[in-house]
Regions:
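N-lobe entry segment of adenylate-forming
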Residues: 1-40, 44-59, 63, 87, ...
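Conserved pre-ATP/AMP-binding loop-to-beta segment of ANL
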Residues: 26-29, 139-140, 164-184, 191, ...
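Conserved AMP-binding/adenylate-forming core of the ANL superfamily
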Residues: 27-74, 78-82, 99-104, 155-158, ...
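Conserved AMP-binding A3 loop
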Residues: 39-44, 173, 180-204
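Structural core segment of the AMP-binding/adenylate-forming
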Residues: 58-59, 86-158, 474-476
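AMP-binding/adenylate-forming catalytic core of the ANL superfamily
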Residues: 98, 104, 115-117, 270, ...
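Conserved AMP-binding/adenylation subdomain of ANL enzymes
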Residues: 203-220, 228-269, 282-288
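Gly/Ser/Thr-rich phosphate-binding loop
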Residues: 267-272, 281-345, 357-359
């Protein structure tokens, strides 16, 4: 579906995409807030965005500036994204699970000029305020029932209206190649890297997902993945907007409320990771609770890490809901492949390219035959412009005109792709990316640790769990529990090892490279 009428051309940036929907269907519902029951039609949403944009302008935000967003899932999170975009500013979502020093790194590295922060997290910003020299303005978002007083500066007592009609901010020229989002993902050095995604990237991925899954204005998606990840932004928000549909914003995944939400809001699809499917199966082994209406549910969309075939089979049989697997990464805005939402689905496969190009190459960047393993490479409208302030990382990732994902997989004779391993050793725990070296460096800071190595190990609930191996310094004594507690104080909880084993030595190859497969074998056999 290409969004063209006699009056408006195909949108090339996110402001045009929003304006298109307001022009076409101003009274059509767009956002439903589960936490307080509020609704935004497209017209009301646009008004709220313009008012929030005016607030940012009043605090000196201009085109090209970065605005950090530290908020829980809410309708206001989407409003904040668009308030940045209509000004030509970059939205900088911050993972709320990070520790304070991790937040400071992301905010400082992105050179953010302003921040929108929920009152729930305000104390965390106060704790590191002196370490955020570039941040000129902090604007707080409160959960007040009066929608006219939700955004305010921390220093002020008066709120700023976001619901009533407001004069639009100055109309800034925005091109499809202008930056829209800087989102941080772990890099090969263990330090997070800022992915620069353009307006064209985000619009393209919304179009690709919406068209592939045949979304229409009748579709109502459920956003339960965190909005600081591109999964929630692209898969269940922007694709809904592109199709003229709607999305229900839930603060977080709740096992007890999940099927009620599907029924009450008549949700037709939702985004998920394998962990969520497993939890739902364990909680509702007999299927959807009686009295709830889920017949309108078309399918579940699942990504981040491969889903075990047995989980897919059980989920589809138990809940009569197909699971459509896909593959992508922050660097591809979100999705690069999806299984077809029909009988062609292949459990275990991540599907077919949905609008970008994708192939498998060897270490010399030569194409490999179907069925042979190699590195997955991508190119297309949804691929990032580059890494912020990281020209070397950008040059390494883009070779011969293709983005190198670091993921190992293969393509079958029918064009379906399969992800087998991650070349980069990245751990994906419940949809969260974890780079082992970061954990290693924390462990090395402990006075009793001589050597450390972290790996991902299979886990029925989270897909992967974090396990570490350490060698003690001569004469040192420390328990595994003490080491885990040490890590808990220094990294986000989801990154913390759940198992730390003390070993005599870390297995290494002839070149000194740690043999992580040997560590995995040791973990599995002990």
């Amino acid at each position: 579906m290409i969004l063209e009428t006699d009056s408006l051309p195909e949108p090339t940036n996110l402001r045009e995409l929003m304006d298109y929907r307001v022009f076409e269907s101003p009274c059509q519902p767009f956002l439903f807030s589960e936490v307080d029951g509020r609704e935004y039609a497209y017209g009301g949403f646009s008004n709220a965005v313009h008012a929030a944009g005016q607030l940012l302008v009043s605090h000196g935000v201009r085109k090209g500036d970065v605005v950090s967003l530290l908020m829980p899932n809410s309708a206001e999170y989407i409003i904040a994204y668009f308030a940045c975009w209509i000004l030509g500013a970059l939205a900088g979502p911050v993972n709320s699970l990070l520790k304070e020093h991790e937040i400071a790194f992301v905010v400082n590295n992105s050179e953010a000029k302003a921040m929108l922060v929920h009152s729930e997290f305000e104390h965390r910003i106060h704790a590191i305020r002196s370490h955020l020299p570039n941040l000129k303005s902090i604007i707080r978002f409160d959960d007040e029932k009066d929608a006219t007083r939700r955004f305010r500066t921390i220093e002020e007592s008066d709120g700023y209206p976001i619901q009533p009609r407001a004069e639009p901010p100055p109309l800034i020229p925005i091109g499809s190649d202008d930056d829209a989002i800087i989102i941080y993902t772990s890099g090969t050095t263990g330090k997070p890297k800022g992915c620069l995604l353009t307006h064209g990237n985000v619009v393209a991925n919304a179009r690709q997902i919406s068209n592939w899954l045949s979304f229409t204005e009748e579709d109502r998606l459920l956003t339960i993945m965190p909005l600081f990840h591109m999964n929630a932004v692209s898969v269940t928000t922007m694709s809904a907007l592109y199709a003229g549909g709607s999305t229900v914003i839930s603060p977080k995944f709740s096992t007890s409320q999940f099927w009620r939400l599907i029924s009450d809001y008549q949700v037709t699809s939702f985004g998920s990771v394998a962990t969520m499917l497993s939890i739902l199966l364990n909680t509702y082994p007999d299927g959807v609770p009686e009295g709830l209406q889920t017949g309108q549910l078309r399918f579940a969309m699942c990504g981040s890490a491969p889903v075990p075939a047995e989980i897919i089979k059980r989920f589809e049989e138990t809940f009569n809901c197909p699971v459509v697997e896909g593959y992508g990464l922050s660097e591809s805005t979100c999705r690069s492949t999806f299984n077809p939402p029909d009988e062609r689905r292949r459990p275990g496969s991540c599907g077919l390219p949905i609008g970008n190009e994708m192939k498998v190459v060897d270490d010399n960047d030569h194409d490999v035959p179907d069925g042979e393993l190699g590195e997955i490479v991508l190119r297309g409208e949804n691929i990032l412009k580059g890494y912020f302030k990281s020209p070397e990382a950008t040059e390494t990732a883009f070779r011969n005109g293709w983005f190198h994902t670091g993921d190992v997989g293969y393509r079958d004779k029918d064009g379906f792709f399969y992800i087998v391993d991650r070349k980069s050793d990245m751990i994906i725990r419940g949809g969260e990316n974890i780079y082992p070296r970061e954990i290693d460096e924390v462990l090395y800071q402990h006075p009793a640790v001589a050597a450390a190595a972290t790996i991902g190990v299979p886990d029925d609930l989270y897909g992967e769990e974090v396990a570490a191996f350490i060698v003690l310094k001569d004469g040192s004594k420390v328990s595994e529990e003490e080491l885990i507690s040490y890590c808990t104080e220094r990294v986000a909880d989801y990154k913390c090892p759940k198992s730390i084993r003390i070993v005599a030595e870390i297995p290494k190859g002839a070149t000194g490279k740690i043999l992580k497969r040997e560590l995995a074998r040791i973990y599995a056999t002990e």
